[in-house]
């Protein structure tokens, strides 16, 4: 006679074991109709699963985040159902959920085309609209293997052979004649899976290993209702317009090429943005009392073994050899900063020491994961490490948090998600060390009034971390800033200071990055601003143009005045109509266009227009120089006339 406790604290008693759906039906027909699955004692379960003992239960509907994920997972099975009908010889591999959707890896003897995707999507919709029930059956390991052997599914058999214990009872989900294997849960009926869209096909190696066969990965998105799907597709269209790769090419910011995968060739205008970001961060380093250092980009393997990187991070490290010694190109800056700290005796009176570097790092990311500036192999971190005592942890982490919010606000980011990532399975240090480190970060977050989400097992191998994720104008999340507490690395590298009692102590090390990878941050703000960089960041801040040749000397005079004032300015003296010039520089997202005609020369002024088409009227040269200097100095986000 299980007693079921509901989220509001009310209880329901049943004479016999009861399914999640039956509990929902006992509450009301409306809830039963909306039920996708349940959360039994915090664990997600199918609607058909039986509850035989006293339990807490929360019904999952399409309004819940879990409900939407289940819909997406079931759409992956629906994709399998449809593609099997259209291509009976296809072999199904894996079909998990991802952000905003799902994918399925399939093995087919020919490449899928857009026409194929359209046909698969059409068949999926036809099947879903029959509103068939999804039937879950638990079977023995052998029965599951026999099922997939009969159906000619080698990848499902491999999953059983390599990933599932022989004593397990795998769940098979029956979609009419199609059968898939999954942990679940899944929707009880396909009426929940009417709103989806197949998006693209890409290559993917089986199990992510390039030694294995290349499969075809079909991507899709799925939502709870028609409106959500339409809104998402609109956001995708806007994201495509804002794609930093497209804008980067149009604005001549950078390029990448096959001979240097994951490495950036910065062009003049892109490098201008890069240097402006460095300059801005340097002003903040001075404000928050950091010293700036520079470490070598490569160090001996022996050092990386002492830090634990060689054992825990080797797959992502580039290595080289010289004179019978093995070196690693640094994937991060922290070991080098400890070496700088170790030069000379340090006292507790010297702490905290805040050490910052624009460190050039390299990580051997899989080629399939590389994506423009967002995922690269060579990048520059606005990295810092703070050496302090345990008593200083909370105040130093608080200072880091303030610096994070200070810097992000300059770029207009105010919606910031905070996450606390705890100890991973593969780590250094004992549990007592991790307890202290996790507790230290949690206390600092609480003291600063920040709500946060805990990410179990997502910390670095050497310490837990706070992550700051930015929400952009398209409601996408970008993880940028991190604050990590490290009790292990300084001790491994023999860092110490003389304490107040004259004894030797190991300092605590706080790892801190705000922009994260500068390359990636440029990609993020390129998309956030759609290439319309605020004046202080714009590679060219103003263009001065003539109407006829007779104004050429005056244009040069205005250009020189702006350039002498530190404004990034160009002159355009081409023999083209002024409207043509304005359009061209508007497409280049230049903030201000200064037009010089005979009237402007006579008045000693310039006529000013913005890239958004606003006519600001006329200004004397000195007036406009002063206005622009002040705007750049303030690092404002808006142009004149946009206030």
From Swiss-Prot:
Keywords: Aminoacyl-tRNA synthetase, ATP-binding, Cytoplasm, Ligase, Metal-binding, Nucleotide-binding, Protein biosynthesis, RNA-binding, tRNA-binding, Zinc. Binds 1 zinc ion per subunit. GO terms for molecular function: ATP binding; metal ion binding; threonine-tRNA ligase activity; tRNA binding. The keyword Cell membrane does not apply. Its cofactor is Zn(2+). Its EC number is 6.1.1.3. Residues 243-534 are annotated as: Catalytic. Residues 1-61 form the TGS domain. GO terms for cellular component: cytosol. It is found in: Cytoplasm. It catalyses: tRNA(Thr) + L-threonine + ATP = L-threonyl-tRNA(Thr) + AMP + diphosphate + H(+). Zn(2+) binds at residues 334, 385, 511. It comes from the Bacteria. It is an enzyme of class 6 (ligase). Disulfide bonds: none annotated. GO terms for biological process: threonyl-tRNA aminoacylation. Its main location: cytoplasm. Pfam families: HGTP_anticodon, TGS, tRNA-synt_2b, tRNA_SAD. Belongs to the class-II aminoacyl-tRNA synthetase family. Catalyzes the attachment of threonine to tRNA(Thr) in a two-step reaction: L-threonine is first activated by ATP to form Thr-AMP and then transferred to the acceptor end of tRNA(Thr). Also edits incorrectly charged L-seryl-tRNA(Thr). NCBIfam families: thrS. Homodimer. This is Threonine--tRNA ligase. It comes from Actinobacillus pleuropneumoniae serotype 5b (strain L20).
